[in-house]
Amino acid sequence: MEFKRHNDFSEIDPAAWNALVEQSIADTPFSRYEYLSEWWKTLGGGEWKNPQLILVSASDNGSLVGIAPLFLHEYDGQQALLLVGSIEISDYLDLIVREADLPRFLPALLDFLASSLPETWSALDWYNLPDASPTLPALKAEAERRGWNYHEEIYRPTPRIPLNGSFEEYLSRIEKKQRHEIRRKMRRAAESGRVRFYVVDKNADIEPELEAFFHLMVQEPNKALFLRDVMRDQMSRSIRAAHEYGYLWLGFLEVDGVKAAASLNFDYKNKLWGYNSGVSRDFMELSPGWVLLAHTIQWCCENGRYEFDFMRGDEEYKYRFGGVNRYVMRARAIR
């Protein structure tokens, strides 16, 4: 295996990168070339100041085998190598490598990082690794073999709704009180004659829909604080990239022809990944946020999606809708 450090994302072919992602342990929207390369341009919407890119690829006979998208930054008392995308806006991160290649890729990667980087680093600090990622036991074993200090902890819950049937079948599995509440709110919205749910067409001009989404997002004070200019730029880049590559799912609920709620998701690998949302305060009597989420789950059921992933966060509504916890982890190895 031949390892190479790259100074820029443009040095790796996007098609080869994404083809590897789709065969890898990291097959999520957040590992794709278009997402991570755009993330790097704004450093996660201003999350990091002056990090150093450590983008490493491994090839066999000219064929891409693995990618370690890393950056160097002082963090938590160490000169740490973190995964590009860390920490706050990329819900799942991992090494980009086929599971069968991980046992030879990871030790060779660590050897390369230890021997070939002119920069001094003292830790690997990898956030948002899925709890089922084979990277976790592999990194633990490799760190122990090298005499490094290894620590692993739950970072955030990522509740998910398993879906394998009709919307009625889904409703039958959630708590009775919540089932009645969802049905009641959907029925009230429908009977008002004022409400329309729609999903933005994949061929639509995304710019006006993007503006409408941000307008709704900032109705919530915490999200308004979050969506400063550099973060808005970052999110716009991510949304445009997902739209260009065909996996953006942006749904709206209109009341009297006015957009009252928005749901931003990635429709990727036969599941919906719930990334963000926004709700107007003008139509709260119709519970537009709840009604839109219910319609979104119904859409998943009717279109054969096997799961709705709420992604990171333990907000109560996720569990009311039947979310079951999985987790993303933080793995830290100090040498």
Each model region followed by its residue ranges:
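A generic secondary-structure signal for well-formed alpha-helical elements
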Residues: 24-28, 72, 117, 193, ...
